[in-house]
Regions:
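N-terminal small/glycine-rich loop or linker at the start of catalytic domains
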Residues: 37-40, 103-127, 159, 163-167, ...
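Glycine-rich, positively charged N-terminal anion/phosphate-binding segment
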Residues: 21-22, 26-31, 46-67, 74-144
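Alpha/beta enzyme core
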Residues: 80, 84, 136-169, 177-254
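Alpha/beta catalytic cores of nucleotide-metabolism and tRNA/nucleoside-modifying enzymes
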Residues: 2-33, 37-42, 47, 69-70, ...
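Short, solvent-exposed amphipathic alpha-helical segments in soluble enzyme
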Residues: 59-63, 144-147, 272-274, 297
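Active-site beta-loop-alpha junctions enriched in small/polar residues
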Residues: 46-48, 100-102, 131-133, 158-160, ...
């Protein structure tokens, strides 16, 4: 699979049979400046994925389980969901936006900015991630983010995409530490909210600069760093090298967030044990398993965790799709026909992820891909799970699973 796809064996429905590292827990809290991240788990920024609908979906994912039905019923009667209760149920402590161009933010009209910077009260704490290469432009974008009400601002130094690197953004800047220093100083001077950075090991194995970069971030007044433990040259291939997360943690006094190859609660515990990092960041596993944050919280507390039933998956798929439709109806950022078309497209995109482990999932995906509207997609989902309840289904083949897994979007 080329481009943004990748293939990975997923283990969350059949977790590895080993005990959690003795005495190790994903921390109950991490503080980034004055902001409390409770628990210390972070949803990674992912292009085309972590919009406001997906972020709220992740924050409330535990409410889509059959054992939470009474909670859902009670919450639906309220005008809004209590953020503290929801955090403890979902296990996701910090949400992050899709990465957004600083050049775009500084130039676009206020009405268009809302398309990229929209968030709701139940998303706090939330960070906005920006990318670019001009210190003054990034500083102006950071001011816009702060004025919009975000809790944190994050700088992307990790994206390996050619179109971003070609503009000297994302991981392209890893070859220019002096420029990064200028950016750190400009953004830090521009805002008072916590300022963080996400970066990779370096451009390639011959240019690993993550420890030096982390020390620079601390010296310039940044409040935390997040490391995806691969080089830009690696992209999303090979194993994440967690030993470098440990090296960064030993080198700085500010919080360190570890990222890379966390697919199960066991992985999260192992990363904490091996690196001593202050929090874990989860990207590509979240679209396929929105329960992963809750499972990490359960595993930390008890050493075991629940796996979703088919009924849970039905509720999850239907709820997310309905959230997409509701947001499209409410949004004014595009003409209605365009909004609805975009929504139907996103439903099809996510269908291959959410149906992991569902008997006959390929049949549901095929029917969703043929649907022309969001309403038709919802009808196909309901019809499929109704038939599944009656026993009319066929198991997903290994070939189908490989195709679905290769379609995931990289973070």
């Amino acid at each position: 699979m080329s481009g943004r796809g990748f293939t990975v064996k997923k283990n969350w429905d059949n977790p590895r049979e080993h005990a959690m590292p003795e005495g190790v827990r994903v921390p109950a809290e991490m503080r980034i400046g004055p902001v409390s991240i409770t628990p210390a788990t972070v949803l990674a920024p992912m292009a085309g994925v972590t919009d406001t609908v997906f972020r709220r979906f992740i924050r409330h994912a535990s409410l889509f389980s059959s054992d939470q039905l009474s909670v859902v019923s009670d919450q639906e009667k309220a005008s809004e969901i209590d953020a503290e209760v929801t955090n403890s149920q979902s296990g996701c402590g910090l949400l992050m936006t899709e990465f957004t161009s600083a050049d775009g933010l500084s130039r676009m009209r206020e009405s268009k900015r809302k398309r990229y910077l929209t968030f709701y009260d139940d998303e706090h704490p939330i960070a906005a991630q920006i990318f670019g290469s001009n210190p003054e432009t990034l500083a102006e974008a950071a001011r816009i983010v702060q004025d919009t009400g975000f809790d944190l601002i994050d700088l992307n130094l990790g994206c390996p995409a050619k179109r971003v690197v070609g503009c000297n953004g994302g991981s392209g800047l890893l070859r220019d530490l002096p420029k990064i220093g200028e950016i750190f100083r400009a953004v830090r001077k521009a805002v008072t909210i916590p300022f963080t950075v996400k970066f990779r090991l370096g451009w390639n194995d011959a240019q690993i600069i993550c420890v030096e970069l982390a020390r620079m971030a601390e010296a310039e007044g940044l409040n935390a760093v997040a490391l995806h433990a691969r080089t830009r040259e690696q992209g999303y291939t090979g194993q994440a090298r967690w030993e470098w997360i440990a090296a960064v943690k030993q080198a700085v006094g500010i919080p360190v967030v570890g990222n890379g190859d966390i697919r199960t609660p066991e992985d999260a515990a192992a990363m904490i044990a091996q690196t001593g990092c202050d929090a874990v960041m989860i990207g590509r596993a979240a679209p396929s398993n929105p329960w992963i944050f809750r499972q990490i919280a359960q595993y930390t507390a008890t050493g075991s965790y629940e796996r979703p039933t088919a009924e849970d998956r039905h509720r999850l798929i239907r709820t997310y799709f309905q959230m997409l439709l509701d947001e499209a109806e409410a949004s004014q950022s595009l003409p209605k026909d365009a909004r609805m078309g975009e929504t139907a497209g996103k439903m099809k995109q996510f269908a291959s992820w959410f149906t992991h482990g569902v008997p006959g999932g390929a049949k549901l995906r095929a029917s969703i891909y043929q649907a022309r509207t969001g309403a038709e997609v919802l009808a196909q989902v309901d019809g499929f799970f109704s038939a599944l309840d009656s026993g009319d289904s066929s198991a997903e083949t290994e070939e189908e699973a490989i195709y679905r897994e290769s379609a995931l979007v990289c973070d």
